[in-house]
Design a protein with these regions (language model features):
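Beta->alpha turn/N-cap motifs
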Residues: 33, 164-166
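N-terminal pre-domain/capping segments
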Residues: 1-94, 98, 128, 132, ...
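Conserved small/polar residues in nucleotide/adenosyl-binding loops
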Residues: 190-194
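Glycine-rich, phosphate-binding/catalytic loops in enzymes
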Residues: 24, 47, 152-153, 179-181
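Short gly/pro/ser/thr-enriched loop/turn and capping motifs at secondary-structure boundaries
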Residues: 38-39, 168-170
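A short alpha/beta connector and helix-capping loop motif
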Residues: 173-188
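Glycine-enriched alpha-helix->loop->beta-strand junction motifs that scaffold or abut catalytic
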Residues: 26-28, 156-161, 184-187
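Active-site acidic/histidine proton-transfer and metal-coordination neighborhood
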Residues: 16-20, 54-57, 72-164, 171
Length: 194
């Protein structure tokens, strides 16, 4: 069965507007990316709890967090990053009653394969401690932006799942027919404009 979810922040910044947009379109699952003008990674526990209550009252479940996890330079202080972003987002996922987080594979990382795979594996392990699964999205200018590198991640990082964004592959000059054929069995499908 196909379940539709949406980034409702494209309808409005405020959670009340997002609920309105989802309700008008008969969508019962949201991928939370921004709440009341704040990135999901920056909301407080109290804001997360209030958001969850409002969504549930409207008959909407949080499908996943549309997080910025991994949208950072590969040369970041990774020990600090794990605490400030990875653990924090997994904690928020628990408050919001979701077991999925969308994430990415680092900027300026094309020549840092070993470090990328090590960091991704550590992030997957942390997420598992919270009962959360990470979903890597292909995106321009991160390590996993081409079919070849996404397949490398698929083969190298156990427990990591994938979000397939055809528009992002197109932006990287990839043939969408080849990418979907190669990744179809390993991913969730995401649609957007290119």
């Amino acid at each position: 069965m196909i379940k539709l979810c949406a980034f409702a922040d494209e309808y409005g910044k405020q959670i009340t507007d997002q609920i309105e947009g989802l309700t008008l379109n008969n969508i019962h699952f949201v991928e939370l990316r921004n709440v009341d003008g704040k990135n999901i990674a920056d909301i407080t526990d109290e804001e997360a709890e209030n958001c969850y209550k409002r969504l549930v009252a409207a008959g909407i479940s949080v499908w996943s967090l549309g997080s910025p996890m991994g949208k950072v330079d590969i040369d970041c202080d990774f020990e600090e990053y794990k605490v400030k972003k990875v653990h924090r987002l997994c904690h928020l996922a628990n408050i919001l009653h979701t077991d999925k987080i969308r994430m990415f594979s680092f900027f300026h990382a094309y020549d840092e394969r070993e470090k990328v795979m090590k960091y991704l594996a550590e992030m997957v392990k942390i997420a598992a401690e919270y009962g959360v699964t990470l979903y890597h999205e292909n995106e321009k200018e991160i390590y996993g932006d081409t079919l070849e590198r996404v397949l490398d991640i698929v083969r190298s990082v156990d427990g990591l799942k994938f979000v397939y964004d055809p528009a992002n592959f197109i932006q990287c000059g990839q043939d969408s027919a080849k990418t979907i054929a190669a990744l179809f069995d390993n991913c969730l499908l995401y649609t957007s404009d290119a």
